[in-house]
């Protein structure tokens, strides 16, 4: 009887735990640009120093995603964490599968990120460009 009780607890708690993980990971990617860094909040979030940016561009497509290295990929297009794109590990912070995507390259990492709408993504890109002062 004891083992049936434990199995029932597992069967009940597993969907609840999975639901919590999906809820937490599917929250909107909050991204802010401060004076000297870009902050991506949430699960697999990161801080990117503006001074470390070597390349910055707005891309319509991203390379093919070969596999998840350390991250989460949800059915609604959200992707967060490290992914293998072509032959390199890249950090993705994607709200959806539609471009444009902001591409950022530093000495240590490469990133692709986008926001819920084209307008918000372009606005974030403009903010980063302004902070970086690519003149």
Question: What are these model-predicted stretches?
Answer:
Residues 62, 96-135:
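Terminal and domain-flanking low-complexity segments
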Residues 20-51, 55-57:
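Conserved beta-hairpin
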Residues 1-5, 9-12, 47, 54, ...:
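Solvent-exposed, well-ordered amphipathic alpha-helical segments
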Residues 1-30:
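Alpha-helical transmembrane spans
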Residues 9, 16, 31, 82, ...:
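A generic structural signal for ordered alpha-helices
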Residues 41-49, 55-107:
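Non-transmembrane, membrane-adjacent beta-strand/coil modules in membrane-associated proteins
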